[in-house]
A protein has these predicted regions:
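Transmembrane alpha-helices and adjacent helix-loop boundaries
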Residues: 1-410
């Protein structure tokens, strides 16, 4: 069989402790990355050029499915570090994503603040004054958003030093409601706009338009250049792949072992020299860093503009939690599997339920689809918690072990 360790052996402890125990796993990952970075963009481009797909369909796949999947994967990675590896329950993931989004917006506009002064007629007028030069690099904005969110996460992670379990979940839920209230009430966060709407200004990376538009002169005529969906997709994909690799190495090292010791039994971990204070706060910081980047990516690449804080409500926090539970707690792979499952199931239901209802003469509207979606998610959570607590990642691991042993039953 092709999936065997026969002929593969290691001559050093470093290689024996590598991420991939089988070469097939490494080749499989490289194959997935090749498909994501090369096959998908080139394939969709050729399909559009060949008339097999409309350009609007291609843009829909990028803007409504692929980008959302990448943003959810980044958020699930962050929550899995905190809940899956360190055992600290959080219901404030969406709020931390909101912190990242608003941070990216403020730094992209130079941290504007409003002053009032008298004009020539003696009337008071408002003027926005930037504190810093505006940042127009989207990757730098994402990193800054993650860093600021990490600080906020540490502040709201302080209760974990005294409480845990259900009580910690309630504390993070309070953080969720408080931060969402700030997003709607603190005028400075949305540049004092009456509609509470924020919109990322035009950004460029390596000369490519990422957000907004750019007008240039070509052959004596003005041409408006809009951001290509492929550009946003490849930037997001690069960020997710890089930080997934960082997370994988982080949880396999000394820090990750300390997190898992706190998760399994915090008293025993303290007895062997692990400091609960630093370990838990570091988990909150790293988790919030990932969630903040997810929020910034959502605003910059996926949404573009945001009205109030509706995109970061409590439902989004539960959705990310469902991704982690269904995908597998304490698994980097499970974060991607759960994000893919939770992201694609609603799209499948939106397409299939109206068609299925039409076959039986039952009208199915958007509200009914949403209710059925919640019912399915709730049922899946119960099923996975009872029958497969380790999630889809464990099923994937079992499948690989069965493949290695085939055709023998042991």
């Amino acid at each position: 069989m092709f999936y065997r360790e026969a002929g593969q052996f290691y001559t050093s402890y470093a290689k024996d402790q590598g991420i991939f125990q089988l070469k097939q796993d490494k080749y499989g990952l490289w194959g997935i990355l090749f498909i994501a970075f090369v096959v998908v963009p080139v394939g969709l481009y050729l399909m559009v050029q060949g008339g097999l797909m409309a350009a609007s369909t291609k843009d829909y796949l990028y803007n409504s499915i692929f980008l959302l999947l990448l943003v959810n994967s980044m958020a699930a990675l962050g929550l899995n570090i905190l809940t899956g590896y360190c055992g600290q329950i959080s219901l404030g993931t969406a709020a931390f994503m909101g912190v990242g989004a608003f941070t990216a917006f403020k730094f992209s506009t130079g941290l504007n603040y409003r002053i009032q002064k008298e004009d020539e007629a003696g009337e008071l007028v408002s003027e926005l004054i930037p504190l810093l030069p505006a940042i127009d690099n989207p990757i730098l904005l994402v990193l800054i958003a993650g860093a600021v969110t990490a600080v906020v996460g540490v502040i709201f992670g302080l209760p974990s030093l005294r409480i845990k379990g259900f009580y910690l979940a309630v504390a993070t839920l309070a953080a969720q409601f408080f931060l969402v209230w700030c997003f709607s009430r603190v005028e400075w966060l949305y540049d004092y706009v009456s509609s509470s709407t924020i919109q990322i200004p035009p950004l460029k990376l390596f000369g490519l338009v990422v957000t907004g538009s750019e007008t240039v002169m070509r052959d004596g005529q003005q041409v408006t250049i809009y951001p290509a969906a492929e550009t946003k997709y490849l930037i997001c994909l690069s960020l997710v792949v890089f930080f997934a690799f960082v997370a994988k190495n982080l949880v396999r090292g000394r820090i990750g072992r300390a997190w898992m010791a706190i998760r399994d039994m915090d008293i025993a971990a303290q007895l062997i020299g692990i400091r609960p204070l630093a370990t838990k706060l570091l988990a909150f910081a790293v988790s919030s860093f990932f969630c903040g980047m997810a929020g910034a990516m959502s605003l910059i690449f996926y949404l573009g503009a945001l009205e109030g804080a509706e995109a970061f409500n409590i439902n989004e926090s539960f959705s990310v939690l469902f991704m982690v539970i269904i995908g597998g707690l304490g698994s980097i792979t499970g974060s991607f599997l759960g994000a893919g499952f939770i992201t694609l199931i609603p799209i499948f239901l939106v397409v299939s339920l109206p068609w299925l209802g039409g076959q039986f003469g039952i009208p199915v509207d958007a509200a009914m689809v949403e209710h059925i979606q919640f019912m399915i998610f709730g049922a899946l959570i119960i099923v996975f918690l009872i029958m497969e607590p380790l999630g889809l990642a464990h099923l994937w691991q079992i499948g690989k072990e069965k493949l290695r042993q085939w055709p023998f039953p042991y």
